[in-house]
């Protein structure tokens, strides 16, 4: 899973061991920065189960303000770009690009106020 940084790493190693020269990863959604507090669809029990939050913790420490977390959710911010690069490096991907939340919302065609985006941007 790209969410926790577990299974996909093993799959990547399998691909390289099977002769792949490069592994390019394109997840179907933006990076998850906040655990779902509404549906509990993830097996994650702590925000630190999320690879994004572990990277933020390594960079910023444990008591990170909401403002800093929100900056990591902005795909044009330096923090976001460096977080994605760190995920790519840790997972040994040749490249990693996430969908942008604004593009995802636009493609769904539903008013943003009717969509839950909490796990991506922390906005309730």
Predicted features and spans:
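PRPP-associated nucleotide enzymes
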Residues: 1-124
């Amino acid at each position: 899973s790209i969410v926790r940084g577990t299974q996909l790493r093993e799959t990547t190693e399998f691909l390289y061991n099977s002769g792949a020269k490069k592994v390019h990863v394109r997840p179907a959604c933006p990076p998850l920065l906040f655990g779902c507090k509404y549906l509990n669809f993830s097996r994650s029990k702590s925000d630190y189960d999320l690879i994004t939050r572990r990277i933020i913790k390594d960079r910023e420490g444990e008591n990170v303000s909401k403002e800093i977390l929100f900056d990591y959710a902005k795909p044009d911010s330096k923090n976001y770009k460096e977080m994605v690069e760190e995920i790519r490096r840790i997972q040994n991907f040749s490249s990693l690009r996430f969908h942008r939340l604004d593009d995802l919302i636009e493609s769904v065609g539903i008013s943003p106020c009717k969509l839950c985006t909490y796990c991506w941007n922390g906005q309730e």
